[in-house]
Protein backbone atom coordinates (compact mmCIF):
# COMPACT_ATOMS: atom_id res chain seq x y z
CA UNK A 1 0.00 0.00 0.00
CA UNK A 2 1.32 3.43 -0.96
CA UNK A 3 1.48 6.05 1.79
CA UNK A 4 2.62 8.77 -0.61
CA UNK A 5 2.41 9.03 -4.40
CA UNK A 6 3.86 11.92 -6.37
CA UNK A 7 2.92 11.97 -10.04
CA UNK A 8 4.45 14.22 -12.74
CA UNK A 9 4.99 17.07 -10.27
CA UNK A 10 6.35 20.41 -11.51
CA UNK A 11 6.93 23.62 -9.54
CA UNK A 12 8.88 26.85 -9.78
CA UNK A 13 8.65 30.13 -7.89
CA UNK A 14 7.00 33.03 -9.72
CA UNK A 15 10.06 35.29 -9.39
CA UNK A 16 12.30 32.71 -11.06
CA UNK A 17 12.27 31.30 -14.57
CA UNK A 18 13.80 28.04 -13.38
CA UNK A 19 11.79 25.06 -12.18
CA UNK A 20 12.78 23.42 -8.90
CA UNK A 21 10.76 20.28 -9.58
CA UNK A 22 10.16 19.17 -13.17
CA UNK A 23 7.84 16.23 -13.97
CA UNK A 24 8.91 14.35 -10.83
CA UNK A 25 7.32 11.01 -9.89
CA UNK A 26 8.03 8.65 -6.99
CA UNK A 27 6.20 6.86 -4.17
CA UNK A 28 6.69 5.68 -0.59
CA UNK A 29 5.15 2.52 0.83
CA UNK A 30 3.24 2.39 4.10
CA UNK A 31 5.56 1.88 7.10
CA UNK A 32 8.64 2.58 4.96
CA UNK A 33 11.43 4.93 6.09
CA UNK A 34 12.68 6.82 3.02
CA UNK A 35 15.33 9.52 2.94
CA UNK A 36 16.14 11.96 0.15
CA UNK A 37 19.74 13.12 -0.19
CA UNK A 38 20.86 16.14 -2.19
CA UNK A 39 23.22 19.05 -1.57
CA UNK A 40 21.97 21.98 0.51
CA UNK A 41 20.07 24.72 -1.28
CA UNK A 42 18.70 22.54 -4.08
CA UNK A 43 15.01 22.63 -3.16
CA UNK A 44 14.48 19.65 -0.84
CA UNK A 45 12.49 21.74 1.64
CA UNK A 46 10.38 23.09 -1.24
CA UNK A 47 9.36 19.51 -1.97
CA UNK A 48 8.16 19.16 1.63
CA UNK A 49 6.19 22.39 1.40
CA UNK A 50 4.46 21.01 -1.69
CA UNK A 51 3.56 17.79 0.16
CA UNK A 52 2.26 19.82 3.11
CA UNK A 53 0.04 21.84 0.77
CA UNK A 54 1.81 25.12 1.57
CA UNK A 55 2.73 25.51 -2.09
CA UNK A 56 0.64 24.69 -5.15
CA UNK A 57 2.30 22.79 -8.01
CA UNK A 58 2.01 24.05 -11.58
CA UNK A 59 1.47 20.48 -12.74
CA UNK A 60 0.96 17.00 -11.33
CA UNK A 61 -0.58 15.70 -8.13
CA UNK A 62 0.30 14.41 -4.67
CA UNK A 63 -1.72 11.57 -3.13
CA UNK A 64 -1.43 10.76 0.57
CA UNK A 65 -2.93 7.70 2.26
CA UNK A 66 -5.98 8.80 4.24
CA UNK A 67 -6.61 7.86 7.87
CA UNK A 68 -10.39 7.45 7.79
CA UNK A 69 -11.66 10.77 6.47
CA UNK A 70 -8.53 12.60 7.57
CA UNK A 71 -5.39 13.26 5.57
CA UNK A 72 -2.91 13.82 8.41
CA UNK A 73 0.76 14.71 7.91
CA UNK A 74 3.23 14.97 10.78
CA UNK A 75 6.01 17.51 10.26
CA UNK A 76 9.24 18.09 12.17
CA UNK A 77 11.33 21.06 10.97
CA UNK A 78 15.07 21.63 11.35
CA UNK A 79 14.52 23.64 14.52
CA UNK A 80 12.07 22.45 17.14
CA UNK A 81 9.69 25.47 16.78
CA UNK A 82 8.16 24.76 20.19
CA UNK A 83 5.96 27.56 21.50
CA UNK A 84 7.86 29.24 24.36
CA UNK A 85 4.68 30.17 26.27
CA UNK A 86 3.45 26.57 26.43
CA UNK A 87 4.95 23.89 28.64
CA UNK A 88 6.23 20.69 27.03
CA UNK A 89 3.02 18.72 27.59
CA UNK A 90 0.89 21.48 26.06
CA UNK A 91 3.33 21.82 23.15
CA UNK A 92 3.08 18.13 22.31
CA UNK A 93 -0.73 18.21 22.61
CA UNK A 94 -1.33 21.18 20.30
CA UNK A 95 -1.88 19.06 17.17
CA UNK A 96 -4.58 17.06 18.92
CA UNK A 97 -6.33 20.26 19.97
CA UNK A 98 -6.27 21.49 16.37
CA UNK A 99 -7.90 18.21 15.33
CA UNK A 100 -10.85 18.61 17.68
CA UNK A 101 -9.68 17.23 21.03
CA UNK A 102 -10.46 19.23 24.15
CA UNK A 103 -7.37 20.55 25.94
CA UNK A 104 -7.90 18.00 28.72
CA UNK A 105 -8.25 15.08 26.30
CA UNK A 106 -5.25 16.23 24.25
CA UNK A 107 -3.04 16.42 27.33
CA UNK A 108 -4.15 12.97 28.44
CA UNK A 109 -3.31 11.38 25.08
CA UNK A 110 0.03 13.19 24.70
CA UNK A 111 1.08 12.27 28.25
CA UNK A 112 0.89 8.55 27.43
CA UNK A 113 3.86 8.95 25.06
CA UNK A 114 6.22 10.74 27.43
CA UNK A 115 7.90 7.71 28.99
CA UNK A 116 8.52 6.02 25.64
CA UNK A 117 10.04 9.23 24.27
CA UNK A 118 12.33 9.69 27.26
CA UNK A 119 10.41 12.81 28.27
CA UNK A 120 8.88 11.63 31.55
CA UNK A 121 9.24 14.34 34.18
CA UNK A 122 9.45 17.22 31.67
CA UNK A 123 5.69 17.77 31.29
CA UNK A 124 5.64 21.08 33.18
CA UNK A 125 8.96 22.38 31.90
CA UNK A 126 9.13 25.12 29.28
CA UNK A 127 11.21 24.78 26.09
CA UNK A 128 14.02 27.08 27.27
CA UNK A 129 14.54 24.79 30.28
CA UNK A 130 15.40 21.74 28.15
CA UNK A 131 18.46 20.75 26.12
CA UNK A 132 18.37 20.82 22.33
CA UNK A 133 18.05 17.05 22.17
CA UNK A 134 15.11 16.98 24.57
CA UNK A 135 13.36 19.75 22.63
CA UNK A 136 13.79 17.71 19.44
CA UNK A 137 12.20 14.70 21.16
CA UNK A 138 9.23 16.86 22.11
CA UNK A 139 9.05 18.19 18.55
CA UNK A 140 9.02 14.65 17.15
CA UNK A 141 6.31 13.60 19.61
CA UNK A 142 4.21 16.58 18.51
CA UNK A 143 4.64 15.38 14.90
CA UNK A 144 3.38 11.83 15.53
CA UNK A 145 0.84 12.19 18.34
CA UNK A 146 -1.99 12.48 15.77
CA UNK A 147 -1.03 9.09 14.30
CA UNK A 148 -0.30 10.70 10.91
CA UNK A 149 -0.35 8.91 7.58
CA UNK A 150 3.22 10.07 6.98
CA UNK A 151 5.87 11.92 9.01
CA UNK A 152 8.10 14.48 7.29
CA UNK A 153 11.49 15.11 8.92
CA UNK A 154 13.37 18.11 7.53
CA UNK A 155 17.02 17.63 8.59
CA UNK A 156 15.76 17.10 12.16
CA UNK A 157 19.16 16.96 13.87
CA UNK A 158 21.20 19.39 11.76
CA UNK A 159 21.09 22.14 14.39
CA UNK A 160 22.48 19.89 17.15
CA UNK A 161 26.12 19.40 18.13
CA UNK A 162 27.79 16.18 16.93
CA UNK A 163 27.46 14.27 20.22
CA UNK A 164 23.79 15.18 20.74
CA UNK A 165 23.05 14.43 17.09
CA UNK A 166 24.50 10.93 17.45
CA UNK A 167 22.44 10.31 20.59
CA UNK A 168 19.29 11.51 18.84
CA UNK A 169 19.97 9.32 15.80
CA UNK A 170 20.28 6.31 18.11
CA UNK A 171 17.07 7.29 19.88
CA UNK A 172 15.13 7.71 16.62
CA UNK A 173 16.54 4.44 15.28
CA UNK A 174 15.36 2.59 18.39
CA UNK A 175 11.95 4.29 18.30
CA UNK A 176 11.35 3.45 14.64
CA UNK A 177 12.37 -0.16 15.21
CA UNK A 178 9.82 -0.44 18.04
CA UNK A 179 6.83 1.05 16.22
CA UNK A 180 5.67 1.25 12.62
CA UNK A 181 5.60 4.66 10.99
CA UNK A 182 5.87 5.94 7.44
CA UNK A 183 8.72 8.45 7.43
CA UNK A 184 10.10 10.70 4.70
CA UNK A 185 13.30 12.46 5.78
CA UNK A 186 15.54 15.10 4.24
CA UNK A 187 19.24 15.02 5.09
CA UNK A 188 22.65 15.61 3.57
CA UNK A 189 24.23 13.25 6.14
CA UNK A 190 24.85 9.98 4.27
CA UNK A 191 25.59 7.92 7.39
CA UNK A 192 22.40 9.16 9.06
CA UNK A 193 20.40 8.17 5.98
CA UNK A 194 21.95 4.69 5.80
CA UNK A 195 21.53 4.04 9.51
CA UNK A 196 17.84 4.97 9.61
CA UNK A 197 16.38 4.26 6.18
CA UNK A 198 14.84 1.37 4.29
CA UNK A 199 15.44 3.22 1.03
CA UNK A 200 17.37 6.29 -0.09
CA UNK A 201 16.46 8.61 -2.96
CA UNK A 202 19.30 10.57 -4.53
CA UNK A 203 18.86 13.61 -6.72
CA UNK A 204 20.71 12.82 -9.97
CA UNK A 205 19.88 16.02 -11.84
CA UNK A 206 18.47 19.48 -11.28
CA UNK A 207 15.72 20.51 -11.38
CA UNK A 208 14.35 17.50 -9.52
CA UNK A 209 13.32 15.12 -12.25
CA UNK A 210 14.91 11.72 -11.73
CA UNK A 211 15.67 10.24 -8.33
CA UNK A 212 17.97 7.25 -8.06
CA UNK A 213 16.51 4.76 -5.56
CA UNK A 214 18.89 2.68 -3.42
CA UNK A 215 17.55 -0.07 -1.17
CA UNK A 216 19.30 -0.24 2.20
CA UNK A 217 19.35 -4.01 2.60
CA UNK A 218 21.08 -3.96 5.96
CA UNK A 219 19.53 -6.20 8.59
CA UNK A 220 17.64 -4.64 11.48
CA UNK A 221 17.94 -3.94 14.35
CA UNK A 222 20.79 -1.57 13.57
CA UNK A 223 23.14 0.37 15.83
CA UNK A 224 26.37 2.32 15.49
CA UNK A 225 28.34 -0.90 15.04
CA UNK A 226 26.41 -1.19 11.77
CA UNK A 227 28.32 1.81 10.40
CA UNK A 228 31.53 -0.26 10.51
CA UNK A 229 30.16 -3.16 8.45
CA UNK A 230 31.34 -3.82 4.89
CA UNK A 231 27.74 -3.52 3.61
CA UNK A 232 27.38 -0.07 5.14
CA UNK A 233 30.72 1.17 3.83
CA UNK A 234 30.00 -0.13 0.32
CA UNK A 235 26.59 1.57 0.20
CA UNK A 236 28.14 4.81 1.44
CA UNK A 237 30.73 4.60 -1.34
CA UNK A 238 27.99 4.05 -3.93
CA UNK A 239 26.08 7.12 -2.76
CA UNK A 240 29.20 9.29 -2.74
CA UNK A 241 29.96 8.19 -6.30
CA UNK A 242 26.46 9.21 -7.44
CA UNK A 243 26.76 12.61 -5.74
CA UNK A 244 30.26 13.16 -7.15
CA UNK A 245 28.95 12.36 -10.63
CA UNK A 246 26.15 14.91 -10.17
CA UNK A 247 28.67 17.59 -9.15
CA UNK A 248 30.85 16.84 -12.20
CA UNK A 249 27.96 16.84 -14.67
CA UNK A 250 26.53 20.10 -13.38
CA UNK A 251 29.83 21.82 -12.65
CA UNK A 252 28.92 22.01 -8.97
CA UNK A 253 25.67 22.99 -7.31
Q: Positions of the model-derived regions?
A:
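Conserved ABC ATPase "signature" region
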Residues: 104-122, 174
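Helix-to-loop junction immediately C-terminal to a conserved catalytic motif
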Residues: 52
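Catalytic Walker B motif of ABC-type/P-loop ATPase nucleotide-binding domains
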Residues: 151-154
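Conserved signature/switch motifs of ABC ATPase nucleotide-binding domains
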Residues: 125-128, 146
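Hydrophobic anchor residue at the start of the ABC signature
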Residues: 140
